[in-house]
Amino acid sequence: MKDTVMAYLLENSIKFKGKPNPKAAMGKILGENPDLRSKVKEVNQVISEVVKEIETMSLEEQQAKLDELAPEGLGQKTERKRKEIELKNVKGNVVMRFAPNPSGPLHIGHARASVLNDFFTKKYNGKLVLRLEDTDAKRVLPEAYEMIQEDLKWLGVKVDEVIVQSERLETYYEYGRKLIEMGQAYVCDCDADEFRTLREQGTLCKCRDTIPEENLKLWEKMLAGELDNVAVRLKTDIAHKNPSIRDFPIFRIERTPHPKNGIKYHVYPLMNLSVTVDDHLLGMTHVLRGKDHIVNTEKQEYIYNYFGWEIPEYVHYGILKIEGPVLSTSKMHAGILSGEYSGWDDARLGTLRALRKRGIRPEALYKLMVEIGIKQADVRFAWENLYAANKDIIDKDARRFFFVESPKKLVISGADSRKIDLRMHPDRSELGNRELLFDGEIYVSDDLEAGKMYRLMELFNIVVEKVENDILYAKYDSDDFAIAKSNKASIIHWIPVKDSVPVTVIDENAEKIEGFAEKDFAVVKEDDFVQFERFGFVRIDEKVDNGYTCYLTHK
């Protein structure tokens, strides 16, 4: 591992005139070496050690070492081919579904299920159904019906058919009635706490032995809105080792007006009934779900068996552990209503809209979710892997600029005015050049100390003389980089005061970072990606007044 890390850091250091940038190197290391993505802590430790070694080398020594470690250049080695994930028992046409609740737009957790279903239906030339599970009126956000479809389109998920459960209530009633007629379901008016106690004891409730004819009468009264505080329960094994499976409910009374149905209906199916009926009628061949649904799978198999239906192939994958942004839809919605969050695309949220706003490309997220796959072990969502994949996509088109955050004015004496031409991109001359004009007054972001030497990137060496009224004063010292190196001078980037462009960068915590970019930054357009050198990649959000608002994508 050390030689690999050393090679990438040497390449990075040479690019930056002898000073390695660990964060930038980390992204490339992980992006081009997938086998190291699970060893981020170890890689970080090795980077720290290697940086110390590199800082003792001259540029010539760095180049010689890089030639020794990677004579054919980095990224030339053949990457080990990853085995493509597959479904079991594929026979004929594959039909799958992605079934979110329309309580808000999609977030990162939804991305896994939607991407994997899309991946498999494309792989096997199958059909993907988007099923909006909106039978709980209290959890429905009306605008989410459209937002979810917009999010899937952005992510590259191809939906072949859209099903809305609240539009299928009569179908669920039909199968609920059949279960009652078969004597496999009954209307229960037991108090919830009373039933819970009986269930824990494995004792039958008084309603269980009601004959089907009487249950059908009660069922009709439920549909007519004449009953409250009743439920329809499915007969299972009252002695089942898992109490939650014992006679679980499949219909309930719900008086909350529904965004689509208003108060037309009072009886709504619970998930295990509606999901089973839909999966059968829509011809699902394979169902992907988290392993937290294993109990639901067992519950649904009772219904399959009562009707004699073929059970689809279930795939239960591990939990995706996501740290960082807010994922709870209810918390996000409450925060938006209170003004805590600016909207569903607030940078602090884990929605796909927030990732899009920050500049995450859908191809990067899609690729990562396929790599995570359907393994049963729980998985930690590695942000660094997403960022590495995203960098692979945007780096080739991202023009480079200097950006000075929290700017401080620096006046330099003893130096002639000069013009510097730099490439917009180190590897793509066709993207053109940018021009910096030094005329004695610049902005810097670093806190400079009086008496110390500093190297202005791509310019010359200075020595700071004093700080007065928040303005820094320095004198020109020399052009020679070797002098800066021998004095261990820090290299700092800078912006000419004249023609500087005001920029606000919003980071992942929704904090605003104010600063200036160089004058040629004004060529950018909305949705462009650029790299602010030694700061990070940003997405251009909008032009405001005489400046720009950008979102920090990642380092």
From Swiss-Prot:
Organism phylogeny: Archaea, Methanobacteriati, Methanobacteriota, Methanomada group, Methanococci
UniProt cross-references to Pfam families, sorted A to Z: tRNA-synt_1c (PF00749), tRNA-synt_1c_C (PF03950), tRNA-synt_1c_C2 (PF20974)
Protein name: Glutamate--tRNA ligase
Known catalytic reactions: tRNA(Glu) + L-glutamate + ATP = L-glutamyl-tRNA(Glu) + AMP + diphosphate
Any Gene Ontology biological process: amide biosynthetic process
Localization per record: Cytoplasm
Motif ('HIGH' region): 100-110
Gene Ontology molecular functions: ATP binding; glutamate-tRNA ligase activity
Organism, scientific name: Methanococcus maripaludis (strain C5 / ATCC BAA-1333)
Chief subcellular location: cytoplasm
Keywords tagged on the record: Aminoacyl-tRNA synthetase, ATP-binding, Cytoplasm, Ligase, Nucleotide-binding, Protein biosynthesis
Cellular component, GO, one term: protein-containing complex
EC number: 6.1.1.17
Keyword Cytoplasm: yes
Biological function: Catalyzes the attachment of glutamate to tRNA(Glu) in a two-step reaction: glutamate is first activated by ATP to form Glu-AMP and then transferred to the acceptor end of tRNA(Glu).
The organism's place on the tree of life at top rank: Archaea
